[in-house]
Amino acid sequence: GLVCLIEEQPAVLICDLPSEENEQFQLKKYGLYALKHTYNQGIIFKGFAVPAENLLQVNRGNGLTIAYHGLNLGRVALCANAAGTMRLMMASMIPWGQFRRTYGEAIADRELVRRRLGRMAGLIVACDALVAWCSTMLDQGYRGEMECIVAKIFGSEAQKEAAIELFMKTHGGRSFLHGHLFGDNVHEYLAPCIYEGEGEMLGMAFFKSLVKHHGSTYFEPIGKALHAAGIKKPNPFNPGHAWALKGPLS
């Protein structure tokens, strides 16, 4: 699927990529710390022809509606991947805790390490629950956009916390050895905070979605009435201002 602009409107096209590069289609190779386990290449299109019948049509919205649906699926997948990744971390922490001894006792018996394992177990269960919730809604035909945003933000932040605060600190200096699960994959653990939408930006988008209906229903008419009356600094104690707002506030 290719997201593009057609007559200044977002659209999605289904396109078949050529088997080799040509003047209209080239691959851009670049270094990337994250996703190093995948075959990652940039794609450059120059006058690339796509049949008109490959344009996807939607009953409501435009191409962004299709793109956002794909993002929703990706955000749920991110949360599911976080749960699986944290399971791998825990599977490494438990035997290490039994092997590593300090002051004559395995660190697995220390309350600090037990707290970390308990915290990670809770994060895993929470991610599993969010995946089940969101995937069920999507399977039933709901857009689930806000729910998937919650899953993405929580899953990425949970994985970051688990990697840095729980996994790395339990393994100590060994975390930075070549071949260690943390050192070899630290960028993979942090990338979800950025990919599929940066977390804090998504949080603001989530809030905007929550208040959009209320704002357009109640506050927008007030703004329009003030603009029509030429009032830039409304004063509720000014009778003229109050009269201008009698409609929206009634």
Question: Model-derived features: where do they sit?
Answer:
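Glycine-rich beta->alpha junctions and the first turn(s) of the following alpha-helix
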Residues: 26-123, 192-193, 208, 223-250
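Structured core elements
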Residues: 1-3, 12-14, 42-44, 152-154, ...
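Gly/Pro-rich turn-and-neighbor structural signature
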Residues: 114-169
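Alpha-helix capping/hinge segments and adjacent helical runs
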Residues: 145-242
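Short, flexible helix-adjacent loops and helix caps
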Residues: 98-105, 136-143, 172
